[in-house]
A protein has these predicted regions:
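Residue-level marker of positions within ordered structural domains that often coincide
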Residues: 33, 94, 134
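Short amphipathic alpha-helical segments
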Residues: 10-14, 85-89
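Core segments of cupin and vicinal oxygen chelate
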Residues: 3-9, 15-65, 99-101, 105-108, ...
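Short beta->alpha transition motifs characteristic of CBS
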Residues: 69, 134-137
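Conserved, structured core segments of small domains
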Residues: 54-82, 87-88, 94-97
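Short, acidic, Ser/Thr-enriched surface-loop or helix-capping motifs
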Residues: 126
């Protein structure tokens, strides 16, 4: 098998389904400090990381985070449930307790299930109900 990196795909976007793309993009913009791309709206919104996203000229850039409105969106249920989570986002922070007020003010809620036995991460729900974690770096 050839190891020609020019032929390998490059991760450009991670896209979250949600009931309102602009609302969820604003939430993640607040907690990450990323810019909302011009032209974002309730159907499709994109956040661009500092320094810009991935481009063909810069395949080692950081992937952007996008949101798309889905009619009849149903939030994932975790752990278990009729609509299981298919993936989640982990954010590394220096101090979970110091960062928690930021995500709560932005609209997150603390998930009732906290499986970390050593306090290395804490689970939250974003305004659309997607689980995400703050992880001690």
């Amino acid at each position: 098998m050839s190891d020609n990196t020019a032929l390998r795909p490059v991760l450009d976007l991670v896209v979250l389904d949600c009931p309102d793309a602009l609302e969820l993009a604003r939430f993640y913009s607040t907690i990450l400090g990323w810019d909302l791309e011009a032209g974002s709206d309730r159907d499709w919104s994109t956040l661009v990381p500092p320094g810009g996203g991935v481009t063909p000229e810069r395949p080692d850039g950081r992937p952007s985070l996008a949101f798309q409105r889905i009619d009849d969106f149903v939030a994932p249920t975790w752990p278990g449930g009729a609509h299981p989570q298919q993936f989640h986002l982990d954010f590394t922070v220096l101090d979970i307790d110091e960062t928690e007020p930021l995500v709560l003010r932005a609209g997150a809620t603390v998930h009732e299930h906290q499986p970390s036995e050593n306090g290395g991460f804490r689970v939250y729900l974003d305004p659309a109900g997607h689980p995400f974690c703050l992880c001690r770096g």
